[in-house]
A protein has these predicted regions:
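Short, low-complexity disordered leader/linker segments with a strong preference
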Residues: 1-44, 69-70, 118-125, 329-330
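Hinge/cleft segment of the Venus flytrap/periplasmic-binding protein
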Residues: 43, 177-181, 185, 196, ...
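Extracytoplasmic "Venus flytrap"
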Residues: 43-71, 76-90, 94, 98-100, ...
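Hydrophobic alpha-helical segments within soluble ligand-binding/sensing domains
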Residues: 45, 88, 145-172, 217-219, ...
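Short, solvent-exposed amphipathic alpha-helices that sit
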Residues: 56-70, 74, 153-157, 184-203, ...
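Short beta-strand elements at the ligand-binding edges of bilobed clamshell
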Residues: 78-80, 136-162, 208, 278-289
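Hydrophobic alpha-helical
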Residues: 96, 102-122, 193, 207, ...
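Flexible loop/hinge segments that line or gate small-molecule binding clefts
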Residues: 111, 115-152, 173, 269-277, ...
Length: 330
């Protein structure tokens, strides 16, 4: 998705760019997925969504539903897992029983999918993973993945923080609000950030706990962090809703978010960008939720028996408080 960003005059930080990956899984040995299926006038697709735990997820669901319409040649069966993997497994089995043409999954966690994916493969139903990834011992169980490079997002966040605070003489105390443990977003952002700061001896992660990608839990965990240690210099929230919760907790504790405590967040939903402009969030890294059109395109290619090997995706931005941009384009 193209972004039009207006820069303020001279002396501002350059916008850091990170890339999404829209790629077929399994390296270069892609199979001609769907080649045994007949092309039909309507593609029956079952989509198992994580839930509605965040504003990003709501936007992702809207994008999928908007793209997978009858007008566009699809019949969509939608299942909300309410953040429970067992609900997703049940939904996928129902899709298999229904005989859908394609299954799309935005998984709660990376692991625990082997059995049900083998069932889908046995039924000759291709599977597309959306946003988060799934780890299996057999790459052929997943036909394609549409999502972001979460590890690179974490690395870029670390690079920004080093640029801002790397030369400080004292310790920089960091609190991390993790997403759902075991999700590829949590794994990638955690790993990327830790690897990015490993050579900064004065950077100390003094607290780290899941906020489950929700605002309420993010606030609860941040309140707990503040009770345990008031000397927190930086909060890294692995999505915007948790950042909002952290901001509320900091304000309640008499601290000024963005000034007393540096806030780094991910997703770049519109409400978060407003907080970048107001100075409450210092750095924001976008993770585009609009995967629907790409999933629709992939599903059509798969049903035609075409190879789905997509090497690159759109360019997205890391924006900071020093940027001036038109929020209404988001």
């Amino acid at each position: 998705m193209r972004r039009s960003i207006k820069k303020v005059a001279a002396g501002l930080l350059a916008t850091m760019m990170i890339g999404t990956m829209l790629t077929g899984c399994g390296g270069g040995n892609k199979k001609d997925s769907g080649s045994s299926k007949k092309e039909t006038s309507e593609i029956n697709i079952g989509f198992s969504q994580v839930g509605a735990e965040s504003d990003w997820r709501v936007a992702n669901t809207k994008s999928m539903k908007s793209a997978l319409t009858a007008k566009n040649g699809f019949k969509l069966s939608f299942a909300d897992a309410q953040q429970k993997q067992e609900n997703q497994t049940k939904a996928v089995r129902e899709f298999i029983t229904q005989g859908v043409d394609v299954i799309a999954i935005a998984p709660v966690t990376e692991t625990g999918w082997e059995t049900v994916l083998k069932e889908a493969k046995k039924a000759d139903i291709p599977v597309i993973t959306v946003d988060r990834q799934i780890k299996t011992s057999d790459d052929s169980l997943i036909t394609a993945w549409v999502g972001s490079d979460f590890k690179k997002e974490g690395v870029k966040a670390a690079e920004w923080l080093i640029k801002e605070k790397g030369k400080e003489k004292g310790d920089v105390n960091i609190a991390v609000l993790q997403g759902t443990i075991g999700s590829s977003a949590e794994i990638g952002r955690t790993k990327g950030f830790k690897e990015g700061i490993k050579d900064q001896k004065n950077f100390k992660i003094i607290a780290s706990q899941t906020g489950e990608f929700t605002q309420a839990k993010g606030q609860e965990v941040m309140e707990s962090f503040l009770k345990q240690n008031k000397d927190i210099d930086v909060v890294v929230a692995q999505n915007d809703n948790m950042a909002f919760g952290a901001i509320d907790a900091l304000k309640a504790a008499g601290k000024t978010p963005g000034k007393d405590v540096t806030i780094i967040s991910f997703d770049a939903i519109k409400a978060a960008l407003k907080k970048v402009q107001s100075g409450e969030i210092n750095a924001e890294f976008e993770c585009n939720p609009l995967h629907g059109p790409r999933v629709a395109e992939l599903a059509k290619k798969i049903m035609k028996g075409e190879k789905v090997d997509i090497p690159a995706g759109t360019t997205i931005f890391g924006v900071t408080v020093t940027d001036n941009y038109d929020i209404d384009i988001y």
